[in-house]
Amino acid sequence: MAVEKTNSSSSLAEVIDRILDKGIVIDAWVRVSLVGIELLAIEARIVIASVETYLKYAEAVGLTQSAAVPA
């Protein structure tokens, strides 16, 4: 994937369009502890993409296959 550099500034609409077109994943992990005792642990994975982009990549890794329904 090539990185394109431009000298002009981008508008907010262009940035949002690019994020939805390419997609972005934010992976976060937070741990709060006091005196060595873990009080809170949070793990989050946030995916921002258009439906078309998500389906394209989800199909590539097999996430769009429907599960068999028991009879």
Curated annotation (Swiss-Prot):
The annotated region (Beta turn) lies at 33-36
Give the family, as the similarity comment puts it. Belongs to the gas vesicle GvpA family.
Which residue positions does the secretion signal occupy?
none
What practical uses are noted? Can be used as an oxygen carrier in mammalian cell culture; addition of 1.8% GVs in the medium enhanced the maximum glucose utilization rate by about 30%. The GVs have both GvpA and GvpC.
Keywords per UniProt: Gas vesicle
Matching entries from NCBIfam families are given as:
PRK09371.1
Where is it located? Answer: Gas vesicle shell
Comment on protein domains: Solid state NMR studies suggest the protein has an alpha-helix beta-strand beta-strand alpha-helix structure. The beta-strands are thought to make an extended cross-beta structure which forms the hydrophobic core of the GV.
Name-wise, this protein is: Gas vesicle protein A
Provide the organism lineage as a comma list.
Answer: Bacteria, Bacillati, Cyanobacteriota, Cyanophyceae, Nostocales
> Where is region (Alpha helix 2) located?
47-70
Q: Where is this region: Beta-strand 1?
A: 23-32
- Which InterPro entries does the record cross-reference, listed alphabetically? Gas-vesicle_GvpA-like (IPR000638), Gas_vesicle_GvpA (IPR047870), GvpA (IPR050530), GvpA-like_CS (IPR018493)
